[in-house]
Amino acid sequence: GMTHQKLFDNLVYFLKAIMPACDEAGVNMAIHPDDPPWDMFGLPRIICKEEDYDNLFAAVPNMHNGITFCTGSLGAGRFNDLPKMAKKYANRIYFAHLRQLKYDGEINFYENGHQTDCGNVDVYGIVKALVEGGFDGYVRPDHGRNVWGEDAKPGYGLFDRAMGACYLSGLFEAVEKDMNRK
């Protein structure tokens, strides 16, 4: 069967093989963390926590090897310190999916409004860490609830994602202005 090490070795083999083309074309790869961040159905998960990123960047140090920083996937693992990770890897985060989770049991959670006070993910702390770390990538609100009677694909409600985009835009503006005052 597939082991953690075999899967990691295959990922490293793939990334090393494509890095010359990424260098030539100026393309950044941005691996999305495993969702959820624990093994499921006998399948190993290898990009779940800070140590996994450290191992990946040690194996493939090329700066075109980067991250999609998904606060939903990483936040499902209560063991992850998301603001710390955001700041540590800010120069390797090329795409950020920011969303809020509310824990409902040991491994159960549900997605909620993007504001920090709506759940257990410190969205403000993450945005602050990204800005302080020099983040220069793309951001989008990840998943939205269906609100106000909206009939949309689950997780992709337009209204909630639009509110999330406005909230995140405001957070980035506030953090950047606060940093410029210091």
Residue map of PLM features:
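Helix-loop segments that flank and shape redox-cofactor active sites
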Residues: 35
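Histidine-acidic metal/acid-base catalytic patches
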Residues: 12-24, 28, 38-182
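Active-site-proximal, glycine-rich beta->alpha crossover segments in alpha/beta enzymes
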Residues: 1-12
